[in-house]
Design a protein with these regions (language model features):
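N-terminal pre-domain/capping segments
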Residues: 1-105, 181-184
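Acidic-and-aromatic substrate-binding clefts and catalytic sites of carbohydrate-active enzymes
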Residues: 18-24, 43-55, 120-122, 129, ...
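Alpha-helix N-cap and loop-to-helix initiation/capping positions
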Residues: 21, 25, 84-95, 123-133, ...
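Conserved beta-strand positions in the central sheet of alpha/beta enzyme cores
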Residues: 41-43, 113, 150, 187
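Alpha-helix-loop-beta-strand connector modules within alpha/beta enzyme cores
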Residues: 62-76, 132-144, 168-178
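An active-site-proximal structural segment forming one wall of the substrate-binding cleft
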Residues: 86-109, 127-145
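Active-site groove signature of glycoside hydrolases
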Residues: 100, 104-124, 148-156
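Acidic/histidine-rich catalytic cores of soluble enzymes
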Residues: 141-207
Length: 207
């Protein structure tokens, strides 16, 4: 490659994975990433402390970075499932994702990414409908702010065991979502490719 990679990509990093909170101070981490000219984007997640959140917002506003927001930790930490067949628990996950949209907007992100929850074979069809319900609600809220909602495709039978899941299932879900919301898309992690069976052409379905 003759040219810099930045000519072709916005190179970013996931803040909480590059600098795990158990080992790194959040503000120091953001400063480090923002001062590294190699990066032009950063993905952050929910910040519990209001004062710290304000400081991070200020740092990001002063930086050259495109801001992305990952809501996955907000679901995985408390064990919430956006496709939970129990309606009350599903609503809890939905509320967390709607709050994530608001926090993402505050921090300067153009949308959020999240993942589907675990599933059981005998309730898979119901779980699919529950996930549609959750995602449509979150997309409706995000659309009012001009923001995107992206579902990250994970493995369906190994580590995360997420409903979305098999690539053909992801393509079907995206098609169903796009009949009602044009601010929905799929987010694909290259490291997940081997765990999603045969991958159909659905890298990103968004406007």
């Amino acid at each position: 490659m003759k040219d810099s990679i930045q000519k072709y990509f916005q190179v970013g990093t996931i803040q909480w994975m590059s600098h795990p909170p158990i080992s790194y101070d959040l503000l120091d981490s953001i400063k480090s990433i923002a001062s590294d000219e190699y990066f032009s984007a950063v993905e952050v997640t929910s910040i519990m402390d209001e004062e710290t959140r304000k400081k991070v917002k200020h740092l990001l506003e002063q930086s050259h970075l495109k801001v992305c927001f990952g809501a996955q930790p907000s679901l995985l930490g408390p064990g919430l499932n956006p496709n939970d067949v129990d309606e009350d628990r599903r609503k809890q996950a939905e509320e967390v994702l709607i709050k994530a949209v608001d926090e993402a907007e505050y921090l300067g992100a153009g949308g959020i990414a999240f993942l589907a929850g675990k599933w059981e074979e005998d309730t898979k069809a119901l779980a699919y409908e529950q996930l549609l319900k959750t995602t449509r609600s979150v997309c409706t809220h995000a659309a009012q702010k001009g923001m995107m909602v992206e579902l990250e495709v994970f493995d369906f039978d190994m580590d995360k065991a997420a409903l979305i899941g098999p690539a053909p299932y992801a393509a079907r879900f995206a098609a169903d979502m796009r009949t009602t919301h044009n601010n929905f898309g799929l987010l694909v992690d290259l490291s997940h490719f081997p765990t999603t069976t045969i991958f159909t052409p659905c890298l990103r379905i968004s406007s």
